[in-house]
């Protein structure tokens, strides 16, 4: 699938959930943004940072591989940008990311996101909600005679 079609499809799926995806002029190298995520995690700001990076890239089409964008996001969620700059320059969190990648590959994961569902296996990539409903209903039939009330 070409990038334009991919992002159109994402926008259609997201629109139903109140999330918009803008057309992407480029695919950013997200490694430094991910290192920033590890920094944010250590400073109690991971969720806010992660959501801000998501919006910056997917909604506002910002280049999350650009250090200035990363620092602007970090500042916006209350992180110390001087300390983050040092961490990024020294690649302090790179070994952690590399270990996570190695662990994922060792366990057979090659795409993000990957969801592991007990009684089924794994589902890779951005899938429609109906895919998960179908899988969970199948697992439910095997593991639970009572239907899940919350699934529509």
Ranges and model annotations:
Residues 1-60, 147:
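Structural alpha/beta surface segment adjacent to cysteine/selenocysteine redox centers
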């Amino acid at each position: 699938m070409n990038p334009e079609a991919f992002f159109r499809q994402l926008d259609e799926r997201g629109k139903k959930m109140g999330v918009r995806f803008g057309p992407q002029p480029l695919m950013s190298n997200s490694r430094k943004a991910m290192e920033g995520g590890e920094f944010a995690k250590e400073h109690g700001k991971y969720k806010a940072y992660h959501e801000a990076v998501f919006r910056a890239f997917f909604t506002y089409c910002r280049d999350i591989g650009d250090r200035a964008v990363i620092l602007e996001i970090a500042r916006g969620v209350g992180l110390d940008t001087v300390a983050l700059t040092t961490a990024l320059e020294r690649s302090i969190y790179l070994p952690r990311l590399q270990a996570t990648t190695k662990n994922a590959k060792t366990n057979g994961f090659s795409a993000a996101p990957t969801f592991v569902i007990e009684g089924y296996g794994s589902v890779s990539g951005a899938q429609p909600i109906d895919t998960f409903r179908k899988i969970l209903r199948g697992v439910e039939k095997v593991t639970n005679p009572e239907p899940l009330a919350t699934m529509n």
